[in-house]
Amino acid sequence: MVENMSDHSTRRNGKASAESPQNTEHEVLASVLRLRDDALQVLLWQRAREPHLHRWSLPGGRLADDEDVETSIRRQLAEKVDVRHLTHVEQLGVFSAPDRHPSSRVVASAFLGLVPSDVDPELPSDTRWHAVDELPATAFDHEDIALASRERLRAKLSYTNIGFALVPHEFTISTLRRTYTAALGYQVAPTNLQRVLARRGVLEPTGRSLPAGPAGGRPPALFRFTCRDLRITDPFAVLRPPNAPS
């Protein structure tokens, strides 16, 4: 029996065509966090096109051929949402679920970015800060990425000096306590926090203080972090809520 080679070739080519992979696109996204009004907030903007038109999403975009991922996300934050003053940026992870984008194959390199509480960038009209605990409906898997960035921050508050990236250069212990409380999601005792950070060598007094309040009393002392670059200070430490089992 002689097989019809043209039919076999057609079937083979048809199968190959049906199984040929899509071109994979690469995007960069940033979950930029800050502390304001005693809440941890994330920066979101509204999509201007389908899919997920008008849904809130993390800022970012496609990776250019001549950029590495961190250069790309810093550029896109500056150009698209006018966020230029980031005290800390680190890669959060790669999000590559095949169905994360409804119409194409898109792999995302996501970053955690931090903005200090005394910096208030002038945002475009389609961009706002949202409380991480009260996120609106978001596009794609961006809620998962935002929540992952919160967990990364919480973990690093335990064993690094990353708190420097959330506060002004000088601050009171009360401000620092509110920052850690909002970021960690539970109450933090100011005296314990001061003692832990001082023991690790990351916190020092400036010798200055704020003016006393209307009720009088001792003027609040000002402190600062000894280093404003990320440092691992206690690799095995885990901060826990009060009365939590160890």
Residue positions per predicted region:
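Actinobacteria-biased recognition of intrinsically disordered, low-complexity terminal regions
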Residues: 1-23, 34, 231-246
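Short histidine-centered catalytic/ligand-binding loop motif
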Residues: 58-66, 165-166
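Active-site segment of metal-dependent pyrophosphate-handling enzymes
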Residues: 24-28, 41, 70-74, 78-122, ...
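NUDIX/MutT-family hydrolases
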Residues: 110-112, 121-158, 168-174, 179, ...
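Short helix-coil junctions and helix-kink-helix linkers
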Residues: 178-187
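Long, intrinsically disordered, low-complexity Ser/Thr/Pro-rich regulatory/activation regions
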Residues: 205-246
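N-terminal strand-loop-strand
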Residues: 17-56
